[in-house]
Amino acid sequence: MRLVQLSRHSIAFPSPEGALREPNGLLALGGDLSPARLLMAYQRGIFPWFSPGDPILWWSPDPRAVLWPESLHISRSMKRFHKRSPYRVTMNYAFGQVIEGCASDREEGTWITRGVVEAYHRLHELGHAHSIEVWREDELVGGMYGVAQGTLFCGESMFSRMENASKTALLVLCEEFIGHGGKLIDCQVLNDHTASLGACEIPRRDYLNYLNQMRLGRLPNNFWVPRCLFSPQE
């Protein structure tokens, strides 16, 4: 196993099975963040993650963290909160604000550089990257974004500026996703937060098998149309 240097003249990736064991899942470096390369990466179970000033690094970890939407863990306190939620939840109303929120709401720093913001905004304009927004009246207080692959959604990042805002985004997305034929949410790498919400680890090989099946699936044509998903009760 060796780290592969990508060419700027080809969007091809090596097999994820050749990724390093340490650091877990590091597969390649270099290339660019063009829409064609990003889409090729997601179709192969690969995603970019790197620190500012470093070359672009591409990953496909083993195991892979995923969330089956029907297995989302909602605590009793969250259920009570959501019943009386003051939030309005929308889809694809403010992609730019959401990714900027994810980039800025990281005290320890962020991998979401200006180049990353611009790259995913291009994917959004092409209809591949999507956002969920959580509003308190007219203020954006939380949200998440990711990349669609058929009936699989690759979650990239989320942020929260008020109580339970990001959890509300995920809860409403899962309900909407299941209701329209969505199957699986990719969480990339398990952490305490995603584990508490019901995410689990599966072998990379299993994830790639699911991906190959689900990326060919289809949600309703109007699923990702900008719309309101949830409004607070009067």
UniProtKB/Swiss-Prot annotation:
N-terminal signal peptide: none
Gene3D superfamilies: Leucyl/phenylalanyl-tRNA-protein transferase, C-terminal domain (3.40.630.70), Leucyl/phenylalanyl-tRNA-protein transferase, N-terminal domain (3.30.70.3550)
GO terms, molecular function: leucyl-tRNA--protein transferase activity
GO cellular component: cytoplasm
Gene Ontology BP terms: protein catabolic process
Pfam families hit by this protein: Leu_Phe_trans
Catalytic activity: N-terminal L-lysyl-[protein] + L-leucyl-tRNA(Leu) = N-terminal L-leucyl-L-lysyl-[protein] + tRNA(Leu) + H(+); N-terminal L-arginyl-[protein] + L-leucyl-tRNA(Leu) = N-terminal L-leucyl-L-arginyl-[protein] + tRNA(Leu) + H(+); L-phenylalanyl-tRNA(Phe) + an N-terminal L-alpha-aminoacyl-[protein] = an N-terminal L-phenylalanyl-L-alpha-aminoacyl-[protein] + tRNA(Phe)
Location of this chain's protein in the cell: Cytoplasm
Documented EC number(s): 2.3.2.6
Protein keywords: Acyltransferase, Cytoplasm, Transferase
Alphabetical list of HAMAP family matching this protein: Leu_Phe_trans
PANTHER family: LEUCYL/PHENYLALANYL-TRNA--PROTEIN TRANSFERASE, LEUCYL_PHENYLALANYL-TRNA--PROTEIN TRANSFERASE
Family: Belongs to the L/F-transferase family.
Entry function: Functions in the N-end rule pathway of protein degradation where it conjugates Leu, Phe and, less efficiently, Met from aminoacyl-tRNAs to the N-termini of proteins containing an N-terminal arginine or lysine.
Descriptive protein name: Leucyl/phenylalanyl-tRNA--protein transferase
Taxonomic source organism: Shigella dysenteriae serotype 1 (strain Sd197)
